Amino acid sequence: MTRVAAHAPATEARLPEGDDKQRAVEAMFDRIAPRYDRLNRIISLGQDRRWRRHTVAALRLAPGATVLDLGCGTGDLCDVVAAAGYFATGVDFSAGMLAAAHTRAPLARADALSLPVPDASTDGVVSGFALRNFVDLDRFFRECARVLRPGGRLATLETAEPASPLLRAGHHIWFRRVVPFVGATLAKDAEAYEYLPRSTAYLPPSGDLLALVEAAGFAAVERRTFTAGAVQLITGTRR
């Protein structure tokens, strides 16, 4: 299995890896769960709803299709899946996030890298801003391929860095200065909202990310960006 390592600049604390990462991320999301949705709206300037609609629209499945939302958090993406006429099931490893969930979709506490789901049993898989929190991206995409039926669709939404140097500079100011300040002020958890921007270091370059998806068993792998390149949507079809 290929693990994607994070390399923090020397001036920053090194990001955790492996089991340490999983424990740290789970504990962090348990802490911030009660305020997570409110902070999402503020940090994204309300754009997160639009991004989720784009994610679900990219599935292009028949009405009544079954869709797993991996790293579902409080269920925002599950609700968009259901509104599109699909049957959503949410999966997350954070008990705190599941306890704070507002969705009517069924939810399960499980590890997205080892799902309690039969092979080729679902039509679609989505995730929203969860990739950087998984310990092993290669294993994650292979697990998505395992549970999807042939022809099933993957759509995963994640942060990105704008290509333009000017836009990238503005993005860094917002993500690395404003977001931690907002998190410390409103969520009373500076540590969590300093980690979240830095966690983008776990993501490989876009070309490598697409290659991981293809190697896991997906065809027609594509990448779209939104909001001046600050967000990316990766899609693919199970071979």
Describe every region a protein language model picked out.
Residues 23, 157, 161-212, 216, ...:
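C-terminal alpha-helical "lid/dimerization" subdomain adjacent to the S-adenosyl-L-methionine
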Residues 113-124:
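A short acidic, Gly/Pro-enriched loop at the edge of an enzyme's catalytic core
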Residues 138-150:
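A short glycine-rich, Lys/Arg-flanked "PGG" loop and its adjoining helix->strand segment in the class I
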